[in-house]
A protein has these predicted regions:
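Acidic, surface-exposed loops and disordered segments
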Residues: 1-137
Length: 137
């Protein structure tokens, strides 16, 4: 019964619940068990809003139209583009995250445009600030 949620409360996700969701993502299968995908949990409101504005800019909509629908936490899945299976591996991680969230009564929605976000100068700076290698998308 998992479905995309497009309206969230301002209530933060308890750390214990968030950690369970993240753990499920880390146990996702990957091609050749290379485990190239990483998960960046953005819980800081200022950083979350920065990413929301960047995503809105890519959508070519006003920044007040939050592409993250007010979700208090944004989980970003990135994988090493040198791995030929990185898109599939990242997709499996996202599926595990979303199924775990549902099982813990936490709503989720797959939001696209991360690749485009992190190709911008602002996006590249964000990844660099978080010590994410350039080869990840």
């Amino acid at each position: 019964n998992r479905r995309s949620i497009r309206k969230y409360t301002k209530q933060s996700i308890p750390e214990e619940i968030l950690n369970q969701i993240l753990l499920a993502g880390t146990y996702a299968p990957s091609a050749k068990n290379q485990q190239s995908a990483i998960i960046l949990a953005v819980t800081n409101k200022e950083k979350r809003d920065q990413l929301s504005a960047l995503n809105a800019k890519i959508m070519n909509v006003d920044a007040s139209k939050d592409p993250f629908y007010g979700a208090p936490v944004v989980l970003i899945v990135l994988a090493d583009k040198n791995n030929p299976n990185h898109v599939y591996d990242g997709s499996l991680v996202m599926q595990n995250l979303m199924l775990a969230a549902k099982s813990l009564n936490v709503g989720s929605c797959w939001i696209h445009r991360a690749k485009e976000m992190f190709e911008t100068q602002e996006g590249k700076a964000f990844l660099k600030q978080h010590r994410i290698p350039d080869s990840y998308e």
